[in-house]
Structure formats: structure tokens, C-alpha cells
Amino acid sequence: MATFSQKPAEVEKKWVIIDAEGLVVGRLASIIAMRLRGKHKATFTPHVDDGDNVIVINAEKVVFTGKKYSDKVYYWHTGYAGGIKERSARQIIEGRFPERVLEKAVERMVPRGPLGRRQMKNLRVYAGSNHPHEAQQPVALDVAALNKKNVRSA
């Protein structure tokens, strides 16, 4: 029997909504990256974008384990000499765009390249509980019920 290869025209994309309140960042990002790539489907094909559209709400309420909330540092470079910049996870979550912590975690779990960039466009992350995608009728995915370690008990 020949290996199955999904054609781009045969892809069926679903809409999934995840409430990130109280969920651990890395574990949540791993599940989201798998959904975006389509690896949860039996029809997974490496060169085809057959993942789902994922909506994440309450991204400002994600949690870190251990001391990562205060100690984890995100670096970037401005392009100028001596232009290395840094922010802690705490500064970003308490700042203007707290959803970027989760976006960056997922982005670093998706392969780099044209297909990875296209798959990342299927991710919508919102800091609060409101989102403009009710018309797509997203199905709720309860990440907390998948594994007890996905939720941080304070």
C-alpha cells in the first residue's frame, strides 16, 4: 500500500478555542503548535498546511512553573552595535501586550520557513476573554482535562 499524502484541496480546517486561564505556558504552547501543524490528525502530511485554526483567550492569565515568571528573560537585538535588549516574562505579561509570551512560545515550537509562517497565521491570541470569531463556531478544547500538569495549582 502506498503512503498517504494529503492534497491541499482535501484539507478540512476546524476552528478550536482554548481558554488559557491558569494553564502552564510551555505545555499549552506545545498543544497549540501540534494543532497548528495538524499532527493530531491521521491525515498529517509534512509539506501541507492541514492544521486547525486556533483561538486562545485569556492569554494574560497564563502561568509559569518555578521561578520563570520573574527569572525568564526574552532577548532581542535592535541591529545596532550594543543593541541587545531584554525583558523578563513578568515585564511582558504585566505590560501592554501580554499575549506575546504565548505567541513567542508557539512560534518557537513551529518549524521555521514558509510553511511554518503560514501555519502561524492560523493562530489568534487575545489577552482578554473577548474575540471576534463567534461566526466560525469554534469548538472548545479543554486543555486542563488532558493532563493534570497542564494546570498550575497555586
Curated annotation (Swiss-Prot):
InterPro entries tied to this protein: Ribosomal_uL13, Ribosomal_uL13_bac-type, Ribosomal_uL13_sf
Stored CDD domains: Ribosomal_L13
SUPFAM superfamilies cross-referenced by the UniProt entry: Ribosomal protein L13 (SSF52161)
Family matches, as Pfam families: Ribosomal_L13
A molecular function (GO) term: structural constituent of ribosome
A biological process term (GO) from this entry: translation
Recorded GO CC terms: cytosolic large ribosomal subunit
Keyword line: Ribonucleoprotein, Ribosomal protein
Assembly mode: Part of the 50S ribosomal subunit.
Function: This protein is one of the early assembly proteins of the 50S ribosomal subunit, although it is not seen to bind rRNA by itself. It is important during the early stages of 50S assembly.
Family membership noted in the UniProt record: Belongs to the universal ribosomal protein uL13 family.
Name listed for the protein in its UniProt record: Large ribosomal subunit protein uL13
Organism taxonomic ancestry: Bacteria, Pseudomonadati, Pseudomonadota, Alphaproteobacteria, Hyphomicrobiales
